[in-house]
Amino acid sequence: MVNLTIDGKQISVKENTTIMEAAASNGIPIPHLCYLKEINEIAACRVCVVELEGKDRLITSCNNVVKEGMVIHTNSPKVRRHRRTNVELILSQHNCECVTCPRSGNCMLQTVANDLNILDIPYKMKIEKQPWNKEFPLIRDSSKCIKCMRCIQICDKVQSLNIWDVEGTGSRTTVNVSGHKTIEQSDCSLCGQCITHCPVGALRERDDTEKVWDALADPNKIVVTQVAPAVRAAWGEELGFKPGEATVGKILDALKRMGADYVFDTCFSADLTIMEEGTEFIQRFTSGELKDRPMFTSCCPGWLRFAKSQFPHLVKYLSSAKSPQQMFGAVMKTYFAQKLGVKPEQIFTVSVMPCVAKKGEQEMDLFYEEYAGKDIDVVLTTRELVKMIRASHISPETLEDRESDRPMQEGTGAGVIFGATGGVMEAALRSAYFLLKGENPPADAFRSVRAEGFNANHGVQEADFQIDDITVRTAVVSGLGNTRALLNKIEKGEVHYDFVEVMACPGGCVGGGGQPIHDGEELAFERGKNLYQLDESANLRYSHENPDINLLYEEYFEKPNSHKAHMLLHTDHLESMELYGTGYCDYSKK
């Protein structure tokens, strides 16, 4: 242990602890802007400076470790003076139109400036704004960038895509898309991790709330909404709900109050995805098609974008099943439209998702039908949902639990855990076991695929399962850097699997790029626990036991992987890549 004194308090901490960590663990927070533990420890902002007795110059606390006998002052007059100057200099190159910024009230720079009581900027403002296509799902406002380099590091070290880079020198230094490309030309997966790790409002998702307001006000539109499993684990964080209070039923109630005609839980179409994907896996596995390469899940659009740009030769091993979002849209504009006796184009489908990449998926050309338009018309992130609730002047405490509308009312625990890494695999194996043996396995028989406790540096969970005389080798991976490492091992023949689940965001959808932002906190696994608890308490825990799913097959699709199911619930990723490249629309024409 190392003994030192911080602000007059004698403390003991482990060796190699940074000064910032030592102070924080003893109730002394040191302000900072650029620091991300183990990801961005470059001390670029100089806001975390502290005074070390015996040293003339201030030192940064984020990347200097403690030493025996140190006496440190985190808020001396000298520290406050230098910290204030550093923040004023940052503000002089920052667009301070806070009222119109999506991060107002949740901005690290705003918080630090307020705490330092900065009421004026004594330096000449010098703000440059680079052009950006506002139709792209991910928006960057260069006038708000503080050059903290977080986006560069999170994309490089965690997601391995290197989309962002530093360009220019001196006062002209800025961050931009690497390789002098536009964002549309890059290999951006739209995971949104750069958004959730930006300390200010320089990065955000494209705001689509006005499209929804317009649809809600259109008497000729039937607005149908769906809410993804991961949203229920996070939306209440911004509205003051205690854990367990922010139910999906309250989201459905809020959407109804806003004017939605029908409200549904995406758990229904997650169950539908399991029936299609599980059946497909058994067919491909038993036919010997997977002897060289595993079948990969296909419900994460960030992963699909990554696969098509980085490992195009593996695209043929993707499941052909659409994601729950897209299956929902296809069912709404066919089966549900027939139930209502209306034309498909009258139905306006809105998805509430934890994800920025879902906005890109919604716009993919292969999900367009002339008779119905897009499967999904608009995607809102969890953050956009919260904005709309606030704009509707809905008091959160008045929300009540509402059931999904019929006939797609039921969802199972298997559908709920889609939102956590490992959940898709576990849900699929529960039903695959039934399809192979004709009986249910214990509900928790496959829980070893859950990636409990792993982080951005170790994101792979492996498990083998014996079903009679069949051994199924599985792997679960989240985070695209981890995914790249795993795929390279598969390519080299170092590991062998039959079925692999991939999620672009560390921790799965609960850690998605559209979720509420808590600076410096990684909450994916805490949110995931919430979903697993909901599964454990669910009345139904197997997708194949969902009565509304069985009714849908009886009335419309006949059986999983039927011809009609393939027409509406599946897609050919290889063909779509040949026709559309990565599958996203051409934003240059929008």
Task: Please give the residue ranges for each predicted region.
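A short alpha-helix capping/helix-coil boundary motif
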Residues: 1, 131-132, 172-174, 229-233
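Eukaryote-biased recognition of intrinsically disordered, low-complexity regulatory segments
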Residues: 1-9
